[in-house]
């Protein structure tokens, strides 16, 4: 069938032909010829009498056609080729063909062509026809659908079987069920590759929608229309009572103009076919044909004046009363509620609005047998206002519901969806479900047939349900509510997209996790073959990729290809999403799968960096055993990093005052949690640890489980219950204190990566701040090593011990000073960190700061009283490790003398303050650094107010006259550091055991160095910015010679 259609009786060219050349019309009928009629959209304007109509009348001859003026024409397929006699030998498309009969029953054919024959080759193409494409009969639909109709028959048969079980459901239920059937059939149609291309054109997509709707409704018409008729029985009876009382109504009584009376019988006959139409689309086409007939001229030679809205409504009122249709209300409800394919704003929608306004006018009792003069002007005004109002009512109840969902207005959503609950309550109050007594009929009347009632199954013109809209707009709070109301999690729209598809496409991770929790399928493919994972990779939504993969790597298949054969890894590699690629590779995404172009993900790599990542994983996967082949626990440590997936994981139990957790879980679950913490993905951490919103609200008032001893392990008393709730183990076996094979807990990872938002939450949920990894490092070590000030402060405020040592003997202060983080070092000193503690090499924090050439840290330690005379195991002091004539050497020589000279200063107030301007005295040009922390004011902590005299246990420096037998330069000591194999794990590998550098070193004599606890200095400086205006500056006059350190 043709894709284009129009009413040729209203075509300007055909009307002009009948008006100006009726002789040609008679002749073509006598010879059974063909008339060529250009489509309405191709005509420039009115057709004049000077037009060469003879060129458009074809007479059949041998093998071809000839026009009445002797020009040659050939018809080949669906095109007309002009021959001899035409100025331009064009090829004109044939749009469609119709057969007409005259009064003598003589037939002739009319071919509607794309444009006039006089059009030149250089002229512009005709504009689109004014009328939209449309299908008229069920035969046209079957011809259009072809073999696809067989697939629809199976769905329709299934609908017939289930309809009987739900026959007494509400009208909204049946609207939703028919819409679901329509959506399913449309999805099957759009899977056809050829039709999928055509669907990109709006006109063709509308045509497909019309075809599917008409075919579906044709087969279920008896069921649905019978049900609607039952629902509207009382309304139809009331309306019929009114129309039956108006049978004496005359045309003049309602103002029908005489010139329109001629067409009323034809329009009435056409309207009588309404109940023979088996779909809303056909019924609307019937109404449009009625309107067209009423505006048609009684004679083709006489044009009627344009019909205005008043004239149209007058004729419609007369037809509604006089036509023997007993179920107007059922037809109106059926057309309005079961029309899914078209918009209410098109021409058919206008016809429906006009009929609806006329019906409403009659229902109001405004129509009577009064003469037009006696009829009140207000009644006619009401009719026009009613029609205008109906034409403006484009917002349906579904639109209102979706608008509230998109804006997150949960109260309105609950109110709209609670209307369906009222129906259920009414059913429960009935005598029995099938009761039809007077009381029960009153109870359910007005509700079952209320189309304004919306449900979680309702769909819009795109086939989307409320759950689709909530997922598309990221309204996570509404997901729970809609699912609790029965929303179908895996419902698909016209394009085959589920809510999970839309959530992943838009990057709403919280919505994705919720949908997965409610068993949303990750394997559903849309019309393009894309799963939710494909869309998440296409749009670079890394958080959603992790949610899909981490939720259940077994359920989320990574090898599914779309219609192009591309897997998720193909797409991520093509767009260069490094984080997504690593996530997919870590969870077993295949790198050797080929798409339809025979391309592997390696070949699709965007650049060399992406290629190297995949090649490295491809090679390592060939050598590495599968996870199932690796034992649950192994004495050797994994070579792979956390980001590349450990070969195995174990859960370590931390033995403190709370109960011991013993969890056995696959290593993948632990790696998921640690990666989520490292990435700062709060939503994923919440999901894996099963933290609820209430848990996050309760952490402010909760008691830390670290310092709480339970009455017994299962105690739920008021004292233990809050801590039990926060320290619970989730269903997947994960908890806040779970560790991997290397001993890293979530708190370790949060401290290492500076996740200031996660550290407080982990601590409040029972994370142990003293947990040690295999290198015996606590989270505070990692935070200080990386210089994460806020994390270190949070840990110290949570009673983390500042003097714990790792396997190498390093304290958090030594780690901070080694890396040059002076602010973190100052924080540790304020919290009582031991300033002279030594590691396994005998190095103090000052040694490490000097070897790292961190001037500010050295100055900080000296002013806090760090000893410059302590020897390490190589018998070096801090000064021995400094470069000669350097700024650090000057500090080591001058500052201790400056601090010692403060002992002779008498202070009236033992709590006085000393400003650190000493460095300006001995070298004012040395420090002009911005934001130096030691330009702040320091307060003397010891209330004694003065330093004690040095005792006989004073530490002595090494005699410089002794030759250096170590074979190393005093000015350039080497600082040993451990480097990891993986670049992204350099921070973790720093804490691995490294004892080779200490082997064979002699122990230093005890008498050469005092223990840190016996330092002669008993007062310490702390930062105090507020004191700068409270105490006068204490000036110490020292010369370089006076402050110098004497040589031994």
Swiss-Prot record:
The modification Phosphothreonine is found at residue 1022. GO terms for biological process: early endosome to late endosome transport; endocytic recycling; endosome to melanosome transport; negative regulation of SNARE complex assembly; neuron projection morphogenesis; positive regulation of dendrite morphogenesis; positive regulation of neuron projection development; protein transport. Residues 451-729 are annotated as: Interaction with RAB32. GO terms for molecular function: GTPase activator activity; guanyl-nucleotide exchange factor activity; small GTPase binding; SNARE binding. ANK repeats lie at residues 396-426, 462-491, 495-524, 528-557, 564-593, 597-627, 668-698, 742-771, 775-804, 808-837, 841-870. GO terms for cellular component: cytoplasmic vesicle membrane; cytosol; early endosome; late endosome; lysosome; melanosome; neuron projection; plasma membrane. It comes from the Eukaryota. Residues 396-460, 692-745 are annotated as: Sufficient for interaction with VPS29. Gene3D superfamilies: Ankyrin repeat-containing domain, VPS9 domain. It is found in: Early endosome; Late endosome; Cytoplasmic vesicle membrane; Lysosome. Pfam families: Ank_2 (PF12796), Ank_4 (PF13637), Ank_5 (PF13857), VPS9 (PF02204). Residues 451-600 are annotated as: Interaction with RAB38. Residues 618-627, 949-962, 996-1006 have a biased composition (Basic and acidic residues). Keywords: ANK repeat, Cell membrane, Cytoplasmic vesicle, Endosome, GTPase activation, Guanine-nucleotide releasing factor, Lysosome, Membrane, Phosphoprotein, Protein transport, Repeat, Transport. InterPro entries: Ankyrin_rpt, Ankyrin_rpt-contain_sf, UPF0507/Ank_repeat_27, VPS9, VPS9_dom_sf. Residues 1-372 are annotated as: Sufficient for GEF activity towards RAB21. Residues 233-371 form the VPS9 domain. Residues 658-707 are annotated as: Required for interaction with VAMP7. PANTHER family: ANKYRIN REPEAT DOMAIN-CONTAINING PROTEIN 27. Interacts with RAB21 (GDP-bound form), VPS29, KIF5A, KIF5C, GOLGA4. Interacts with RAB32 (GTP-bound form), RAB38 (GTP-bound form), VAMP7. Interacts with low affinity with RAB5. ANKRD27:RAB32 heterodimers can homodimerize to form tetramers. Can interact with RAB38 or RAB32, VPS29 and VAMP7 simultaneously. A decreased interaction with RAB32 seen in the presence of SGSM2. May be a guanine exchange factor (GEF) for Rab21, Rab32 and Rab38 and regulate endosome dynamics. May regulate the participation of VAMP7 in membrane fusion events; in vitro inhibits VAMP7-mediated SNARE complex formation by trapping VAMP7 in a closed, fusogenically inactive conformation. Involved in peripheral melanosomal distribution of TYRP1 in melanocytes; the function, which probably is implicating vesicle-trafficking, includes cooperation with Rab32, Rab38 and VAMP7. This is Ankyrin repeat domain-containing protein 27.
